[in-house]
Amino acid sequence: MTIQWFPGHMAKARREVTEKLKLIDIVYELVDARIPMSSRNPMIEDILKNKPRIMLLNKADKADAAVTQQWKEHFENQGIRSLSINSVNGQGLNQIVPASKEILQEKFDRMRAKGVKPRAIRALIIGIPNVGKSTLINRLAKKNIAKTGDRPGITTSQQWVKVGKELELLDTPGILWPKFEDELVGLRLAVTGAIKDSIINLQDVAVFGLRFLEEHYPERLKERYGLDEIPEDIAELFDAIGEKRGCLMSGGLINYDKTTEVIIRDIRTEKFGRLSFEQPTM
Protein backbone atom coordinates (compact mmCIF):
# COMPACT_ATOMS: atom_id res chain seq x y z
CA MET A 1 0.00 0.00 0.00
CA THR A 2 1.66 3.23 -1.17
CA ILE A 3 0.38 6.35 0.53
CA GLN A 4 1.46 9.83 -0.48
CA TRP A 5 -0.16 12.77 1.26
CA PHE A 6 1.78 16.00 1.61
CA PRO A 7 -0.39 19.13 1.23
CA GLY A 8 1.49 22.30 0.38
CA HIS A 9 0.83 23.84 3.78
CA MET A 10 2.88 21.04 5.38
CA ALA A 11 5.99 21.91 3.38
CA LYS A 12 5.45 25.53 4.37
CA ALA A 13 5.03 24.48 8.02
CA ARG A 14 8.44 22.82 8.01
CA ARG A 15 10.08 26.05 6.85
CA GLU A 16 8.18 28.17 9.37
CA VAL A 17 8.87 25.80 12.27
CA THR A 18 12.58 25.96 11.49
CA GLU A 19 12.41 29.77 11.59
CA LYS A 20 10.44 29.83 14.86
CA LEU A 21 12.81 27.54 16.76
CA LYS A 22 14.90 30.56 17.80
CA LEU A 23 11.90 31.87 19.76
CA ILE A 24 11.16 28.53 21.46
CA ASP A 25 12.35 27.24 24.83
CA ILE A 26 11.01 23.70 24.54
CA VAL A 27 9.21 21.44 22.09
CA TYR A 28 6.20 19.28 22.91
CA GLU A 29 6.24 16.42 20.43
CA LEU A 30 2.79 14.89 20.36
CA VAL A 31 2.49 11.25 19.27
CA ASP A 32 -0.30 8.68 19.32
CA ALA A 33 0.30 6.39 22.31
CA ARG A 34 -0.98 3.44 20.23
CA ILE A 35 1.73 3.96 17.60
CA PRO A 36 4.43 6.16 19.16
CA MET A 37 7.10 5.45 16.54
CA SER A 38 4.87 5.33 13.47
CA SER A 39 3.27 8.64 14.47
CA ARG A 40 6.67 10.34 14.63
CA ASN A 41 7.80 12.00 11.44
CA PRO A 42 11.49 11.11 10.94
CA MET A 43 12.29 14.59 9.64
CA ILE A 44 11.16 16.14 12.94
CA GLU A 45 14.49 15.01 14.40
CA ASP A 46 16.30 17.00 11.71
CA ILE A 47 14.10 20.04 12.29
CA LEU A 48 14.39 20.12 16.09
CA LYS A 49 18.12 19.42 16.38
CA ASN A 50 19.02 19.52 20.09
CA LYS A 51 16.06 21.57 21.35
CA PRO A 52 14.76 20.51 24.80
CA ARG A 53 11.77 18.27 24.30
CA ILE A 54 8.95 16.44 26.04
CA MET A 55 7.34 13.48 24.31
CA LEU A 56 3.59 13.58 24.92
CA LEU A 57 1.99 10.16 24.44
CA ASN A 58 -1.53 11.29 23.59
CA LYS A 59 -4.67 9.14 23.47
CA ALA A 60 -3.10 7.01 26.20
CA ASP A 61 -6.60 5.96 27.25
CA LYS A 62 -6.90 4.08 23.94
CA ALA A 63 -3.53 2.31 24.21
CA ASP A 64 -2.49 -0.83 26.10
CA ALA A 65 -1.21 0.61 29.41
CA ALA A 66 1.58 -1.95 29.80
CA VAL A 67 2.92 -1.21 26.31
CA THR A 68 2.71 2.55 26.92
CA GLN A 69 4.91 2.10 29.98
CA GLN A 70 7.45 0.28 27.80
CA TRP A 71 7.45 3.23 25.41
CA LYS A 72 7.96 5.73 28.22
CA GLU A 73 10.99 3.77 29.41
CA HIS A 74 12.23 3.57 25.81
CA PHE A 75 12.15 7.34 25.35
CA GLU A 76 13.59 8.01 28.81
CA ASN A 77 16.53 5.75 27.90
CA GLN A 78 17.11 8.04 24.91
CA GLY A 79 17.18 11.04 27.22
CA ILE A 80 13.71 12.24 26.20
CA ARG A 81 11.22 13.05 28.95
CA SER A 82 7.84 11.46 28.22
CA LEU A 83 4.34 11.87 29.65
CA SER A 84 1.15 9.89 29.09
CA ILE A 85 -1.76 12.23 28.41
CA ASN A 86 -5.32 12.42 27.15
CA SER A 87 -5.97 15.76 25.48
CA VAL A 88 -9.74 15.15 25.46
CA ASN A 89 -10.35 14.68 29.20
CA GLY A 90 -7.20 16.44 30.41
CA GLN A 91 -5.53 13.43 32.02
CA GLY A 92 -1.83 14.07 32.63
CA LEU A 93 -1.86 17.67 31.37
CA ASN A 94 -1.05 19.05 34.82
CA GLN A 95 2.38 17.40 34.51
CA ILE A 96 3.43 19.39 31.44
CA VAL A 97 4.35 22.75 32.99
CA PRO A 98 6.20 21.27 36.02
CA ALA A 99 8.18 18.95 33.72
CA SER A 100 9.00 21.89 31.44
CA LYS A 101 10.20 24.00 34.37
CA GLU A 102 12.44 21.17 35.54
CA ILE A 103 14.00 20.74 32.10
CA LEU A 104 14.46 24.50 31.59
CA GLN A 105 15.56 25.38 35.12
CA GLU A 106 19.21 25.99 34.20
CA LYS A 107 18.26 28.22 31.26
CA PHE A 108 15.92 30.37 33.36
CA ASP A 109 18.44 30.51 36.22
CA ARG A 110 21.00 31.93 33.77
CA MET A 111 18.46 34.48 32.54
CA ARG A 112 17.71 35.60 36.11
CA ALA A 113 21.45 35.82 36.89
CA LYS A 114 21.76 38.26 33.98
CA GLY A 115 18.92 40.33 35.35
CA VAL A 116 16.42 39.21 32.71
CA LYS A 117 12.85 39.36 34.03
CA PRO A 118 11.19 35.90 34.22
CA ARG A 119 8.71 35.24 31.43
CA ALA A 120 6.35 32.51 30.31
CA ILE A 121 7.78 29.31 28.87
CA ARG A 122 7.53 29.37 25.08
CA ALA A 123 6.72 25.97 23.69
CA LEU A 124 6.11 24.62 20.23
CA ILE A 125 3.64 21.78 19.71
CA ILE A 126 4.55 19.56 16.81
CA GLY A 127 3.21 16.28 15.44
CA ILE A 128 1.51 14.60 12.53
CA PRO A 129 -2.10 15.38 11.51
CA ASN A 130 -4.94 14.15 13.71
CA VAL A 131 -2.73 13.34 16.69
CA GLY A 132 -4.64 15.82 18.89
CA LYS A 133 -2.63 19.05 18.81
CA SER A 134 -5.60 21.41 18.56
CA THR A 135 -7.56 19.52 21.21
CA LEU A 136 -4.55 19.73 23.53
CA ILE A 137 -4.22 23.49 23.04
CA ASN A 138 -7.92 24.05 23.63
CA ARG A 139 -7.79 21.96 26.79
CA LEU A 140 -4.73 23.76 28.15
CA ALA A 141 -6.08 27.20 27.26
CA LYS A 142 -9.59 26.27 28.43
CA LYS A 143 -10.94 27.97 25.31
CA ASN A 144 -11.97 26.81 21.86
CA ILE A 145 -9.06 28.55 20.17
CA ALA A 146 -7.70 25.96 17.77
CA LYS A 147 -9.92 24.30 15.19
CA THR A 148 -10.54 20.66 16.05
CA GLY A 149 -11.97 17.71 14.20
CA ASP A 150 -11.38 14.10 13.31
CA ARG A 151 -10.20 14.93 9.81
CA PRO A 152 -6.42 14.82 9.39
CA GLY A 153 -4.88 18.13 8.40
CA ILE A 154 -7.48 20.45 9.92
CA THR A 155 -4.94 22.89 11.42
CA THR A 156 -3.54 24.87 8.49
CA SER A 157 -1.77 27.86 10.05
CA GLN A 158 0.52 28.60 12.97
CA GLN A 159 -0.72 30.54 15.97
CA TRP A 160 0.47 31.56 19.44
CA VAL A 161 -1.80 30.69 22.34
CA LYS A 162 -1.33 32.00 25.90
CA VAL A 163 -1.93 29.44 28.65
CA GLY A 164 -2.13 31.31 31.95
CA LYS A 165 0.98 33.22 33.02
CA GLU A 166 3.42 30.34 32.73
CA LEU A 167 3.11 29.03 29.20
CA GLU A 168 2.79 30.26 25.62
CA LEU A 169 2.16 27.67 22.91
CA LEU A 170 2.81 27.73 19.20
CA ASP A 171 0.55 25.35 17.30
CA THR A 172 1.63 24.12 13.88
CA PRO A 173 -0.07 22.25 11.05
CA GLY A 174 0.56 18.53 11.13
CA ILE A 175 3.78 17.59 9.40
CA LEU A 176 3.62 14.32 7.50
CA TRP A 177 6.37 12.91 5.31
CA PRO A 178 5.89 12.76 1.51
CA LYS A 179 6.03 8.97 1.16
CA PHE A 180 6.12 6.11 3.64
CA GLU A 181 9.23 3.99 3.27
CA ASP A 182 7.71 1.27 5.45
CA GLU A 183 4.29 -0.08 4.48
CA LEU A 184 3.59 -1.03 8.10
CA VAL A 185 3.94 2.61 9.15
CA GLY A 186 1.25 3.58 6.67
CA LEU A 187 -1.04 0.77 7.83
CA ARG A 188 -0.62 1.69 11.50
CA LEU A 189 -1.39 5.32 10.75
CA ALA A 190 -4.39 4.32 8.67
CA VAL A 191 -5.90 1.93 11.21
CA THR A 192 -5.77 4.63 13.91
CA GLY A 193 -7.33 7.23 11.62
CA ALA A 194 -4.31 9.49 11.10
CA ILE A 195 -4.68 9.34 7.30
CA LYS A 196 -7.73 10.31 5.30
CA ASP A 197 -9.78 7.21 4.47
CA SER A 198 -10.40 8.59 0.99
CA ILE A 199 -6.78 8.04 -0.08
CA ILE A 200 -6.19 4.53 1.27
CA ASN A 201 -7.31 1.01 0.48
CA LEU A 202 -9.57 0.33 3.45
CA GLN A 203 -9.64 -3.42 2.86
CA ASP A 204 -5.84 -3.51 3.27
CA VAL A 205 -6.27 -1.66 6.55
CA ALA A 206 -8.97 -4.07 7.76
CA VAL A 207 -6.79 -7.08 6.88
CA PHE A 208 -3.88 -5.52 8.78
CA GLY A 209 -6.12 -4.89 11.79
CA LEU A 210 -7.46 -8.45 11.81
CA ARG A 211 -4.02 -10.02 11.47
CA PHE A 212 -2.74 -7.83 14.29
CA LEU A 213 -5.64 -8.77 16.55
CA GLU A 214 -5.21 -12.44 15.69
CA GLU A 215 -1.54 -12.31 16.72
CA HIS A 216 -1.71 -10.07 19.79
CA TYR A 217 -5.30 -10.06 21.06
CA PRO A 218 -6.93 -13.26 19.70
CA GLU A 219 -9.40 -13.73 22.56
CA ARG A 220 -10.75 -10.23 22.09
CA LEU A 221 -11.22 -10.89 18.37
CA LYS A 222 -13.11 -14.14 19.02
CA GLU A 223 -15.25 -12.56 21.72
CA ARG A 224 -16.20 -9.53 19.63
CA TYR A 225 -17.46 -11.55 16.68
CA GLY A 226 -18.62 -14.68 18.49
CA LEU A 227 -16.02 -16.94 16.89
CA ASP A 228 -15.08 -20.32 18.34
CA GLU A 229 -11.88 -20.33 16.30
CA ILE A 230 -10.17 -17.79 14.03
CA PRO A 231 -10.02 -19.06 10.43
CA GLU A 232 -6.48 -19.07 9.01
CA ASP A 233 -7.72 -17.91 5.62
CA ILE A 234 -8.40 -14.16 5.71
CA ALA A 235 -11.29 -14.46 3.24
CA GLU A 236 -12.97 -17.00 5.53
CA LEU A 237 -12.46 -14.66 8.48
CA PHE A 238 -14.08 -11.81 6.53
CA ASP A 239 -16.98 -14.12 5.63
CA ALA A 240 -17.45 -15.15 9.26
CA ILE A 241 -17.45 -11.54 10.48
CA GLY A 242 -19.71 -10.38 7.66
CA GLU A 243 -22.19 -13.11 8.44
CA LYS A 244 -22.11 -12.46 12.20
CA ARG A 245 -22.62 -8.73 11.64
CA GLY A 246 -25.28 -9.06 8.95
CA CYS A 247 -23.17 -7.48 6.23
CA LEU A 248 -25.03 -9.28 3.45
CA MET A 249 -26.14 -8.49 -0.08
CA SER A 250 -29.07 -10.00 -1.93
CA GLY A 251 -28.67 -13.74 -2.27
CA GLY A 252 -26.85 -13.95 1.05
CA LEU A 253 -23.47 -12.92 -0.37
CA ILE A 254 -21.06 -11.12 1.95
CA ASN A 255 -20.79 -7.37 1.43
CA TYR A 256 -17.03 -6.95 1.83
CA ASP A 257 -17.11 -3.14 1.75
CA LYS A 258 -19.58 -3.06 4.63
CA THR A 259 -17.65 -5.74 6.52
CA THR A 260 -14.47 -3.69 6.07
CA GLU A 261 -16.19 -0.62 7.51
CA VAL A 262 -17.42 -2.61 10.52
CA ILE A 263 -13.95 -3.97 11.29
CA ILE A 264 -12.22 -0.59 11.06
CA ARG A 265 -14.93 1.16 13.05
CA ASP A 266 -14.75 -1.49 15.78
CA ILE A 267 -10.99 -1.00 16.06
CA ARG A 268 -11.16 2.79 16.12
CA THR A 269 -14.02 2.93 18.62
CA GLU A 270 -12.28 0.57 21.05
CA LYS A 271 -14.70 -2.32 20.70
CA PHE A 272 -11.65 -4.55 21.22
CA GLY A 273 -10.52 -2.54 24.23
CA ARG A 274 -7.26 -0.65 24.49
CA LEU A 275 -4.83 -1.57 21.71
CA SER A 276 -1.18 -0.75 21.04
CA PHE A 277 -0.14 -1.46 17.47
CA GLU A 278 3.62 -1.39 18.02
CA GLN A 279 6.12 -2.00 20.79
CA PRO A 280 9.65 -0.61 21.30
CA THR A 281 11.12 -4.02 20.43
CA MET A 282 9.15 -4.37 17.17
Curated annotation (Swiss-Prot):
Xref: InterPro entries: G_CP_dom (IPR030378), GTP-bd (IPR006073), GTP-bd_ortho_bundle_sf (IPR023179), GTP-bd_ribosome_bgen (IPR019991), GTPase_MTG1 (IPR016478), P-loop_NTPase (IPR027417)
Null allele phenotype: Essential for growth, it cannot be disrupted. In depletion experiments cells become over 3-fold longer, are abnormally curved and nucleoids condense.
UniProt keyword RNA-binding present: yes
Domain of life assignment: Bacteria
PROSITE patterns linked to this entry: G_CP
Subcellular location per the Swiss-Prot or TrEMBL entry: Cytoplasm
Entry GO MF terms: GTP binding; GTPase activity; RNA binding
SUPFAM superfamilies attached to this UniProt entry: P-loop containing nucleoside triphosphate hydrolases
Record GO biological process: ribosome biogenesis; translation
Positions that bind GTP: 58-61, 86-87, 130-135, 174
Main localization, broad class: cytoplasm
CP-type G domain boundaries: 14-178
Alphabetically ordered keywords of this record: Cytoplasm, GTP-binding, Hydrolase, Nucleotide-binding, Ribosome biogenesis, RNA-binding
One GO cellular component term noted in the UniProt record for this chain: cytoplasm
Gene3D superfamilies tied to this protein: 1.10.1580.10, P-loop containing nucleotide triphosphate hydrolases
UniProt similarity note: Belongs to the TRAFAC class YlqF/YawG GTPase family. MTG1 subfamily.
Protein's job: Essential protein that is required for a late step of 50S ribosomal subunit assembly. Has GTPase activity that is stimulated by interaction with the immature 50S ribosome subunit. Binds to the 23S rRNA. Required for the association of ribosomal proteins RplP and RpmA with the large subunit.
Additional free-text comment from the UniProt record: Estimated to be present at 1000 copies per cell.
Assembly and oligomerization: Interacts with ctc. Interacts with the immature 50S ribosome subunit. 2 molecules of RbgA bind to one 50S subunit.
UniProt protein name: Ribosome biogenesis GTPase A
Gene name, Swiss-Prot/TrEMBL: rbgA
